[in-house]
A protein has these predicted regions:
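Helix-coil boundary and interhelical linker segments in multi-pass alpha-helical membrane proteins
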Residues: 64-75, 115-125, 269-270, 370, ...
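Loop-to-helix transition at the N-terminal end of transmembrane alpha-helices
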Residues: 69-89
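Short, Lys/Arg-enriched N-terminal segments with co-localized hydrophobic residues
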Residues: 3-23
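Membrane-embedded alpha-helical modules
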Residues: 119-231, 235, 350-459
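Helix-loop-helix junctions within the multi-pass membrane cores of secondary transporters/permeases
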Residues: 25-62, 83, 104-113, 117-162, ...
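Helix-loop-helix hairpins and the membrane-proximal interhelical loops
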Residues: 24-75, 190-192, 224-308, 449-453
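Juxtamembrane transmembrane-helix boundary signature
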Residues: 85-105, 136
């Protein structure tokens, strides 16, 4: 009798769980339009974890860089995680796009090494500049200025951006693992690092394993590749197991709302602000356009869906990040890894945000995600990103040359924004002197003029 009661209770509980799962899946499907985007909850979740794993390094690197500016590294760690959570949630729930956000590399270096250490200002001054940048971006987004800039980029260059980002991502992966290094003797720009032992060897093993998984069309190949690589790295001595699992996040009291207002009308503030605006705007635009192009998310007019919401999410993210106490928050190029795993909606971003939340309390565990582990995913994603080169018009040299400059300048200058600058400016010059000036839009000319002014007077 008791056994029958148990069976009935088990059956009832199972039905309740199944019903609950069905309701949840239906809600997620309706909210994020999963079926419409040819994806599902499992795919989005794996994509979100993959994105997190390829960008988790920011939790370690950002505090290290900003501590050089006199900021408490523990507080910056918490601010980095919190700003990434909030920013990525906004991108996922509001813009409903699979892009993750966190304090941007390059932007944090400018914050610490240029504004604070070189120019001699306090980190409070730098945080004030970041706050003003975010507020200006909010206004520019409301009045459709940033959206107009995105639309002004020629179609061929948009496709080239995806290819250039692919090469840059691959370079980041190879460099992080020590496969590609900067030689101390200065004989060459880059050289081959140590690939017979340590991180370099582990990264190569990871690339081969991930490549096999991709070739065999294994679902979640990038995620599984990193997981297997991390396990192999333990006996190799490259990946260290943590001494503890749980740790409470440090306080952000020393960085929260730390602003300095008495220098906001100085010439230096104008220069710093313009540089931040320029770097963040075109890094973000390049990432959104490049990754969306690879994911076939562009509409028939070549526009990114919900681009205004995505740009607004980016602007809010920078503002929130400044209040918490970190440098400019931007859309991460590593979002391409999640897209490569099939992520197509905001549920991917929500999953990434959840992983950042876990990282707040489980930071020792996430310490095993070393550059040698993530290199495999970044290199393979680089391959995926360059596939759009097949769609670039190489017959018309006024289209092909700007596209080529966009592609090669991203990895060579280590900058997405600089690649876009070379592409757009050369596009206008070639069209103008080839007698094709009618193909140039006025907005594109204005954007190019801003590029030139920036490089003449600031860089």
């Amino acid at each position: 009798m008791e056994f029958l009661k148990f069976l009935l209770l088990y059956k009832s509980t199972k039905k309740t769980k199944e019903k609950g799962a069905y309701i949840m899946n239906s809600f997620l499907d309706n909210f994020f339009k999963l079926k419409e985007n040819d994806t599902n909850v499992k795919t989005e979740f794996i994509a979100g974890i993959t994105t997190f794993m390829t960008m988790a390094y920011i939790l370690i690197v950002n505090p290290s860089i900003l501590s050089a500016a006199g900021m408490d590294s523990g507080a910056v760690f918490t601010a980095t995680a919190l700003s990434s959570i909030i920013a990525t949630l906004i991108m996922g729930l509001y813009a409903k796009l699979p892009f993750a956000q966190a304090p941007g590399m390059g932007l944090n270096a400018f914050f610490a090494y240029t504004v604070v250490l070189s120019m001699g200002y306090s980190y409070q001054f730098a945080l004030t500049a970041v706050l003003l940048e975010g507020l200006i971006f909010i206004l520019l987004t409301i009045f459709n200025v940033r959206e107009a800039i995105v639309d002004s980029i020629p179609t061929n260059i948009k496709k080239a951006i995806s290819v250039g980002i692919g090469l840059l991502i691959a370079l980041l992966g190879l460099e992080g693992a020590g496969i590609v290094v900067h030689p101390k003797d200065g004989g060459t720009i880059v050289a081959l690092g140590n690939i017979t032992s340590g991180a370099g060897l582990l990264a190569i093993i990871g690339i081969v394993i991930t490549g096999i998984l991709v070739a065999r069309k294994v679902k979640g190949a990038l995620f599984l590749g990193m997981l297997i690589t991390a396990v192999i790295g333990i006996p190799m001595g490259v990946v260290d197991l943590p001494n503890k699992i749980v740790s409470m996040p440090p306080s952000i009291s020393s960085t929260f709302m730390q602003f300095e207002w008495h220098n906001i009308f100085s010439l230096d503030m104008v220069i710093v602000l313009f540089t931040l605006l320029f770097m963040d705007m075109f890094d973000t635009i390049g990432t959104l356009v490049g990754v969306a192009t690879k994911a076939n998310m562009l509409d028939k007019d070549g526009k990114v869906p919900n681009i205004k919401k995505a740009l607004f999410a980016d602007a809010i993210a920078t503002t929130v990040g400044a209040c918490l106490g970190t440098s400019t928050v931007s859309t991460f190029v590593e979002s391409a890894s999640g897209v490569a795993e099939g992520g197509r909606t905001g549920l991917t971003a929500v999953s990434t945000a959840f992983m950042f939340f876990l990282a707040l309390f489980l930071s020792p565990i996430f310490g095993i995600i070393t550059p040698a582990v993530t290199a495999s995913a970044l290199v393979i994603v680089g391959l995926f990103m360059i596939e759009t080169i097949k769609e670039i018009n190489l017959e018309d040299y006024t289209e092909a040359i700007p596209a080529f400059l966009t592609i090669i300048m991203m990895p060579f200058s280590y900058s997405i924004s600089d690649g876009i600058v070379f592409g757009v400016v050369s596009y206008i010059l070639l069209k103008l002197f080839a007698g094709k000036s009618k193909e140039i839009s006025m907005t594109t000319i204005v954007v190019a003029a801003v590029f030139v002014l920036k490089f003449v007077f600031i860089k």
